[in-house]
């Protein structure tokens, strides 16, 4: 009888984007930091990402977050983000889902009211504030990465689209920021397929023309994201709202507006001088879901004025499950995965033994 290989998952969604939190079934990864463990997965064990984001186990529109031990003693746990485009060092929606999962699993004890704790992403420490009411995690507020404008109102000719004006923001990944109305979109759900086609063409054109380098991280690869911006409506003093849509290359229109997309929009509004510290922006997706970003201040980093911000959203629990991996299945590719799998339901070292029962219930 062949050995049974399994992964333990908690599935949640934030704004419609599903995050699959891997809580067990993976051996300890090489690397002294979360960033080094992420790089090991990317270079030597990309099969985990491919497995859970491909049929028959998943689809590219999902994300995966692997819990790993934190390297910083301030953090409760580390997490590695995986998406269709690869390994972003940060994501707001994935952070909201991961923070909710560690509370719902008991890894971080849940308390009524407001509580704070720290997670460790590949980008560094992330401060979390959770709001718990009647035992339910009603909201997670997490730090957005310091965000800035790399390019403001450049122009490019895109075959099948025409001349496109775009800005580029960094908020955990580089985003092309485009005005939806200028491209003929109202940001309604029935436009989803055309939005994906348009974004694909624009991103391909920008990637072919130029690359982008972060002021401390250096080359972080080709531009992976595009954010369609609707008009901004002021709904109260210091509170704004805008329909928005985020595209992830290749081919994915996000269900939510995304946390990093919201941070990128805050950076652009700050660059244009329309925000004051404490101002908030609610981005609203094609499905009517939203995140609230708050501009908390700015500082100079080299040649860039970075916008500090927080993102608030709610994650909804979907499932706790054991995924059975059969490497004899012709639809399952285990070549870049088998060497990190643990047999027999053993938890990853990120999770204490005493939490095993509550996580597998």
UniProtKB/Swiss-Prot annotation:
It catalyses: trans-4-hydroxy-L-proline = cis-4-hydroxy-D-proline. InterPro entries: Pro_racemase_fam. Substrate binds at residues 92-93, 259-260. The lineage of its organism: Bacteria, Pseudomonadati, Pseudomonadota, Gammaproteobacteria, Oceanospirillales. Its EC number is 5.1.1.8. PANTHER family: BIFUNCTIONAL TRANS-3-HYDROXY-L-PROLINE DEHYDRATASE_2-EPIMERASE, TRANS-3-HYDROXY-L-PROLINE DEHYDRATASE. This is Protein Csal_2339. The keyword Isomerase applies. It comes from the Bacteria. Gene3D superfamilies: Diaminopimelate Epimerase, Chain A, domain 1 (3.10.310.10). The active site is at 91 (proton acceptor). In vitro, catalyzes the epimerization of trans-4-hydroxy-L-proline (t4LHyp) to cis-4-hydroxy-D-proline (c4DHyp), albeit with very low efficiency. The physiological substrate may be different. Displays neither proline racemase activity nor t3LHyp dehydratase activity. Belongs to the proline racemase family. Keywords: Isomerase. GO terms for molecular function: 4-hydroxyproline epimerase activity.
């Amino acid at each position: 009888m062949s050995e049974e290989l399994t992964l333990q998952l908690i599935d949640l969604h934030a704004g419609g984007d599903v995050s699959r939190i891997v809580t067990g079934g993976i051996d300890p990864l090489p690397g002294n930091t979360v960033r080094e463990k992420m790089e090991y997965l990317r270079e030597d064990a990309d099969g985990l990402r491919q497995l859970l984001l491909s049929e028959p186990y998943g689809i590219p529109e999902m994300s995966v977050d692997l819990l790993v031990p934190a390297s910083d003693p301030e953090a409760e746990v580390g997490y590695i983000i995986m998406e269709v485009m690869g390994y972003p060092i940060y994501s707001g929606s994935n952070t909201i889902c991961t923070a909710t999962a560690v509370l719902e699993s008991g890894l971080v004890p849940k308390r009524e009211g407001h509580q704070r704790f720290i997670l460790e992403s590949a980008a560094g420490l992330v401060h979390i504030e959770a709001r718990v009411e009647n035992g339910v995690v009603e909201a997670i507020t997490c730090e957005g990465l310091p965000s800035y404008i790399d390019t403001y109102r450049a122009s490019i000719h895109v075959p099948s689209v025409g001349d496109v004006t775009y800005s580029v923001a960094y908020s955990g990944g580089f985003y092309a920021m485009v005005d939806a109305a200028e491209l003929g979109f109202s940001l309604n759900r029935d436009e989803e397929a055309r939005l994906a086609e348009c974004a694909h063409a624009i991103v391909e054109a920008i990637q072919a023309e130029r690359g982008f380098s972060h002021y401390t991280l250096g080359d972080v690869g080709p531009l992976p994201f595009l954010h369609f911006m609707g008009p901004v409506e002021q709904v109260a003093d210091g509170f704004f709202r805008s329909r928005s849509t985020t595209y992830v290359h290749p081919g994915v229109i996000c269900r939510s507006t995304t946390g990093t997309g919201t941070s990128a929009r805050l950076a652009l509004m700050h660059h244009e001088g329309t925000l004051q510290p404490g101002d908030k922006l609610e981005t609203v997706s094609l499905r009517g879901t939203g995140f609230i970003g708050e501009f908390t201040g700015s500082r100079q980093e080299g040649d860039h004025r970075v916008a500090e911000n927080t993102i608030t959203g709610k994650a909804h629990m979907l499932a706790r499950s054991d995924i059975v991996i059969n490497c004899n299945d012709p639809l399952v590719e285990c070549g870049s995965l088998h060497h990190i799998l643990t047999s027999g339901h053993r938890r990853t070292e990120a999770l204490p033994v005493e939490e095993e029962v509550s996580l597998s219930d």
